[in-house]
């Protein structure tokens, strides 16, 4: 799916982010630093990682600047409220940068942190895929601690099965 309009992309991205926020909002405050295994991402690490890569990697590269990814450590934001605020702030800053792009800029090349040249619209699409990947991790981690989560698109698989013709 090629993206030819910045506004179209931003509209879609806001919908994707809304779905991500709904699941992030399910993280229990007291479990923000929980992980399923030592050395693996905590909930806070995942949220900080999504926020920092969006702002300092994807947005910077999209406007044809080098990545400035600072990692996902506690020094960026610690505790539930700070982590959520960090995500909101990084998203707002990213949107400001994305809005500086014109539709023609989507066809330009940018350089990824790995040194690959990629068309800007493809780079932005990979940001969406990256977010969906980590959203899936959050869903799985929440299921491991028995937290009920919202269906991604309004229906569960059981709802779809029930409403399907057989």
Model-based region annotation:
Residues 1-12:
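Extreme N-terminal tail/first-helix region
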Residues 4-6, 78-80, 122-125:
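A short, structure-level motif marking secondary-structure boundaries and short turns
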Residues 8, 15-18, 45, 78, ...:
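Generic recognition of short, well-ordered alpha-helical interface segments
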Residues 10-14, 18-24, 31-73, 111-166:
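Short, contiguous alpha-helical
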Residues 19-22, 26, 89, 93-100, ...:
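Solvent-exposed, charged/polar functional surfaces in cytosolic regulatory/catalytic domains
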Residues 59-102:
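Helix-adjacent hinge/juxtasegments
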Residues 98-114:
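Acidic catalytic patch
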